[in-house]
């Protein structure tokens, strides 16, 4: 019996650790519906809405960093009437905003996934983040060890881009929540 309890203890610790991690990741967290004009989605309640700084930004949500990270993650929902270039052109532009440890563009991952009623291109990359300047807006600061997750939702009238950037550890922890958000993406008529 004592050998059996010794064997079980690591499993109990592992299960307890997994349960704690699920709470940190928001797996059991209630969600709220975010309306971004012609697009809606569900996001964890802890993702706080912040004022947008431009009409092309339909929504912005801030997510507090995990312990050890110094700044929050920010999800920005952009809407561009008529689109904003091809998926490939945007991948190239975003890849150019990041550098790996050798100063080269990092690998960028892209795949097509399903939203609630639309196809979505999910994009991910990481490294030293140096965002491009947007005319008329305050520049974003450069960030070491950053990660970006993007959902691209093209429609006949508008191209939607959900771009989330933050510290690597925080963003890695947020991947399941971001993927759940993508699954809930719903295109509505504008």
Model-derived regions: residue spans:
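Bacterial N-terminal signal peptides that target proteins for export
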Residues: 2-16
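Bacterial Sec-dependent signal peptides at the C-terminal "C-region" and cleavage site
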Residues: 17, 23-31
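Beta-strand-rich interaction surfaces with strong enrichment in secreted/lumenal proteins
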Residues: 31, 49, 110-112
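Secretory pathway targeting signatures of secreted, lumenal, and periplasmic proteins
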Residues: 33, 37, 42-103
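Solvent-exposed coil/turn segments that connect beta secondary-structure elements
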Residues: 37, 66, 80-82, 126-130, ...
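Signature of long, low-cysteine stretches enriched in small and polar/charged residues
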Residues: 45, 55-58, 91-153
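Surface-exposed amphipathic alpha-helical segments
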Residues: 47, 156-190
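Solvent-exposed, acidic/flexible segments
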Residues: 54, 68-70, 83-87, 142-145, ...
């Amino acid at each position: 019996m004592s050998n059996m309890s010794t064997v079980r203890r690591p499993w109990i610790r592992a299960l307890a650790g997994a349960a704690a991690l699920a709470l940190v990741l928001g797996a059991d967290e209630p969600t709220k519906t975010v309306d971004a004009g012609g697009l809606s989605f569900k996001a964890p309640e802890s993702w706080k809405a912040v004022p947008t700084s431009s009409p092309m930004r339909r929504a912005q949500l801030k997510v507090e960093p995990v312990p050890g990270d110094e700044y929050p993650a920010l999800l920005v929902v952009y809407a561009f009437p008529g689109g904003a270039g091809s998926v490939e052109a945007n991948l190239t532009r975003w890849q150019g905003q990041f550098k790996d440890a050798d100063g080269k563009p990092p690998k960028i991952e892209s795949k097509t996934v399903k939203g609630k009623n639309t196809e979505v291109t999910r994009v991910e990359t990481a490294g030293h983040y140096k965002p491009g300047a947007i005319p008329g807006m305050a520049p974003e600061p450069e960030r070491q060890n950053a990660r970006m997750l993007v959902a691209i939702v093209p429609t006949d009238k508008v191209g939607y881009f959900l771009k989330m950037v933050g510290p690597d550890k925080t963003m890695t922890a947020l991947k399941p929540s971001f993927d759940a958000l993508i699954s809930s993406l719903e295109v509505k008529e504008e």
